[in-house]
Regions:
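Catalytic cores and adjacent flexible loops of soluble metabolic enzymes
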Residues: 1-303
Length: 303
C-alpha cells in the first residue's frame, strides 16, 4: 500500500489512494460460476455486504437499440418502418438529444438502405451508429458507409469465450484489441459491447480488458465507450449483492478500477426477471451516463 500514490479525487474532493491494478487472469478452465448458476436450480443471489458509493454522473441520457436488439425477437422492420421509427426517436429525444444515439445492423441491403435513408435526414440526434461482431470483415461495412462510431460485440464471460469463441481469455482479448485498434486507426470510435457481463469474471477479465481499452484511448485520443450488457437478465440492484450479478458493483468496477469515465459507460439490460427498469436506473445512480433501450418494449426474448 505504501507504494500507491495519493491523489486528489476531483469528483469527491478527497485525498485517495491510487487503485490496485488488476492483471488479466488467463485460466485453463472456464469459470462459469456454477455456485450461482446451477443448471438444475434457480439462479442464486448471494451477498457479501460490500457497499459501493453512489456516483451519479453530471448528465444522463438514453441510447437506442430498436433496430438491432429490437429486431431480434420479431419479424424484421421494413425500410419504411425503420425510417418512421427513427423519426419518432428524433422527436422523443428533443433538440438536446436525450435519445443520444441509435444503432443499426449493416449486414443486408435493406439494413444499409435504411441507414442511408436515415442519414439523409441530417439529424444531430439520435446519432446513427452500427453494430458489428469483432471481425475485420464486418468492420469493412462500417468504413464503406462512413459512420463515426460502431458497436463491437466483445463477449466477456467464460461461457462465451471458451464455448462459443473456443479461445482462451488472452487469445480473445488479443482478437478484440486488434479489431478495436483497426477502428481507431481509421478514426472511428469503437463502442465495446461487453456481452454477458453478469456471468463474467469481473476482476479476472473485464477490468483488465477495459484497462487496456483506456490505454488505447489515451494513445489515439479517440473515445472508447463501454456497454455493460446484462445478456441473461441476471443483474440485480440490491446493495451488498456479489459480482458478477451486482449492477452497482459492475459500474463501480468500471469507473473506479478500470478508470472508464461515466460519459463513456452504457448499461444494456434485459427483462427476463422483470428488473430491466430497476437495473437501468441503478446504473445511472452508480455512474453510467447512458442506458440502452428499445421502443415498444420489444427486444430479444423479453425486451
Amino acid at each position: 500500500m505504501e507504494n500507491r500514490k495519493v491523489f486528489l479525487n476531483k469528483h469527491t474532493n478527497l485525498l485517495e489512494l491510487e487503485e490496485h491494478m488488476y492483471p488479466l487472469v488467463d485460466v485453463d478452465t472456464p469459470n462459469v460460476f456454477r455456485n450461482l448458476f446451477h443448471y438444475d436450480e434457480i439462479p442464486k443471489i448471494a451477498f457479501n455486504d460490500r457497499i459501493v458509493p453512489h456516483n451519479m454522473p453530471d448528465e444522463i441520457w438514453i441510447t437506442d437499440t430498436t433496430f438491432r436488439d429490437g429486431q431480434q425477437s420479431r419479424a424484421p422492420y421494413t425500410t419504411e418502418q425503420i425510417v418512421s421509427i427513427y423519426e419518432y426517436l428524433h422527436r422523443l429525444g428533443g433538440p438536446k438529444g436525450k435519445v443520444r444515439q441509435s444503432e443499426f445492423f449493416l449486414y443486408s441491403k435493406k439494413d444499409r438502405d435504411a441507414v442511408y435513408r436515415c442519414l439523409e435526414k441530417g439529424y444531430e440526434f439520435p446519432e446513427i451508429t452500427s453494430w458489428i461482431r469483432a471481425s475485420k470483415k464486418d468492420f469493412e461495412l462500417v468504413k464503406e458507409i462512413g459512420l463515426k462510431e460502431t458497436g463491437i460485440l466483445v463477449s466477456c464471460s467464460d461461457y462465451h469465450i471458451f464455448y462459443k469463441m473456443k479461445m482462451t481469455r488472452r487469445e480473445v482479448m488479443n482478437l478484440y484489441l486488434s479489431v478495436i485498434r483497426e477502428c481507431l486507426e481509421t478514426g472511428i470510435s469503437p463502442r465495446c459491447h461487453l456481452e454477458d457481463i453478469t456471468r463474467s469474471d469481473i476482476y479476472g477479465f473485464v477490468i483488465p480488458f477495459c484497462v487496456e481499452l483506456m490505454k488505447l484511448m489515451d494513445e489515439y485520443k479517440i473515445p472508447i465507450k463501454i456497454r455493460a450488457c446484462d445478456t441473461m437478465g441476471y443483474g440485480v440492484n440490491f446493495p451488498g449483492a456479489v459480482i458478477p450479478r451486482s449492477v452497482p458493483g459492475i459500474i463501480y468496477g468500471l469507473t473506479t478500477h478500470a478508470g472508464v469515465p461515466s460519459e463513456l459507460i452504457e448499461w444494456h439490460g434485459h427483462n427476463d426477471f422483470y428488473k430491466a427498469v430497476n437495473n437501468s436506473t441503478t446504473a445511472w445512480l452508480y455512474g453510467a451516463s447512458g442506458v440502452n433501450c428499445s421502443l415498444f418494449g420489444i427486444g430479444e426474448r423479453t425486451g
